[in-house]
Amino acid sequence: MRKNVQVLVFLAGLGATIANGEPPATKHVDVASIAPRPDDVATIDGMIQAWYDVISGPAGKARDWARDRTLYIPNLRFVSVEVENGQLRPRIRDHQEYVDSSDAALMKGFFEKEIHRVTERFGPIAHVWSTYESRVTENGPVTARGINSIELFWDGKRWWIANGIWTEETRDNPIPRKYLSSSKS
């Protein structure tokens, strides 16, 4: 999910350091602070729907990063696991780093849709395995599939996403059948 873009790793007290030897993204995207939409944060379904809604859209459509930010705890970490030069590498970002590094790519047209979900919950914590497929245009061919692993917690008033980690399906790492059945659980 939140994919294939330059990534910075934030090192506390040291500022931004390049994770993969590439120059940092040069475009900073200002993200306003707004109140969350009640429907987004009231249920796990609302949270996951918002997760996908925010990053999806046609070419030229600005993404609603302010809405996106309302879904996450302040110290959230996004981790994408990618294959680079035959090696698995994590790309670790906070929300601002993700926005700065992916906004331009998403503005070229990107749609991600959940095709299966497994949710496990224990009291105020939940884990969601969300299988997705991506397209450049809303009804275009599937360009990628993968799984988002999303950790959430309930604070008594609303849900929060604490972490998100994802990876794309590859020939050597196909999505297991249990994450592809036709119904969400």
What are the roles of these predicted feature ranges?
Residues 36, 56, 76-90:
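A short gly/proline-enriched turn/hairpin at secondary-structure junctions
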Residues 6-16:
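Bacterial N-terminal signal peptides
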Residues 21-70, 179-184:
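Short, low-complexity N-terminal intrinsically disordered segments enriched in polar/charged residues
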Residues 51, 68, 76, 128, ...:
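Hydrophobic pocket/interface hotspot
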Residues 22-27, 145-174:
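Short beta-strand edge/turn micro-motifs at domain boundaries
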Residues 1-4:
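Positively charged n-region of N-terminal signal peptides that target proteins for export
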Residues 77-78, 87-141:
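Surface-exposed, charged secondary-structure patches
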Residues 82, 130-132, 148, 165-166:
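A mature extracytoplasmic/lumenal domain signature
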